[in-house]
């Protein structure tokens, strides 16, 4: 396998997590997503529940926000500690074994490696709303809010911790529209690209 590591960044509702999991199964490689939260918690000293709820947040900006945010004795925010633990774990996983890593700025964290395929999966708006209402059993209005909130958190976190813009095609090796291609074809394209 020319590319050992596959990172998948995705819009909420795009099916990126499902696609990544299927690719990992078909290639017989490890799959990392929410299952690394325990490792991040251990390294950062925070609870897994806190990591789960706050992993995509960014440090607050502004003097007032800085003054009232949680920081350690070195001045690092809690969000910075989580990000640093996450970064170190992703670097360790990439050294350890071939794998698929979902989100967590892994594309940026591993940008200096030649054996990484960075994928961004997006989806047409109507299809995204349809998927979210079906998966989460919510009304369309709630689906739109969930989508906007989740993608905003991802974008803000990514843009804060990297020198890049989340979702910008030039940051990725491959950008796929899952509503145009379907899950199966997205999986096939990714697997073809890692050969």
List each language-model region with its residue ranges.
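Domain-scale detector for complete catalytic domains at protein termini or as standalone homologs
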Residues: 1-6, 65-75, 83-84, 88-92, ...
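Short beta-strand-centered segment that lines the nucleotide-binding/catalytic pocket of NTP-utilizing
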Residues: 30-41
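Small-molecule kinase domains that catalyze NTP-dependent phosphoryl transfer to phosphate-bearing small molecules
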Residues: 59-66, 139-184
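Glycine-rich phosphate-binding P-loop
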Residues: 8-21
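ATP-dependent small-molecule kinase phosphotransfer cores
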Residues: 41-98
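RNA pseudouridine synthases
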Residues: 93, 109-112
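Pre-Walker A (Motif I) flank of P-loop NTPase domains
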Residues: 2-11, 97
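Conserved phosphate-donor/acceptor-positioning beta-strand/loop module used by diverse small-molecule
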Residues: 112-134, 140-148
């Amino acid at each position: 396998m020319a590319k050992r590591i596959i990172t998948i960044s995705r819009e909420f509702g795009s099916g990126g997590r499902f696609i990544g999991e299927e690719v990992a199964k078909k290639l017989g490689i490890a799959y990392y997503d929410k299952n690394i939260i325990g490792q991040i918690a251990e390294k950062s000293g925070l609870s897994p529940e806190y990591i789960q709820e706050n992993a995509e947040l960014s440090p607050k900006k502004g003097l007032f926000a800085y003054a009232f945010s949680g920081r350690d004795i070195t001045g690092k925010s809690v969000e910075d500690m989580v990000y640093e633990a996450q970064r170190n774990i992703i670097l360790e996983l990439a050294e350890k074994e071939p794998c698929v890593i979902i989100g967590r700025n892994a594309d940026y964290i591993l940008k200096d490696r030649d054996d990484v395929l960075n994928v961004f999966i997006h989806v047409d708006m109507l299809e995204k709303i349809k998927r979210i209402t079906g998966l989460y059993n919510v009304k369309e209005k709630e689906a739109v809010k969930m989508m906007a909130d989740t993608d905003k958190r991802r974008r803000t976190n990514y843009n804060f911790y990297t020198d890049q813009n989340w979702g910008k095609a030039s940051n990725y090796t491959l950008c796929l529209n899952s509503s145009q291609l379907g899950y199966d074809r997205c999986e096939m394209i990714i697997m073809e690209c890692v050969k």
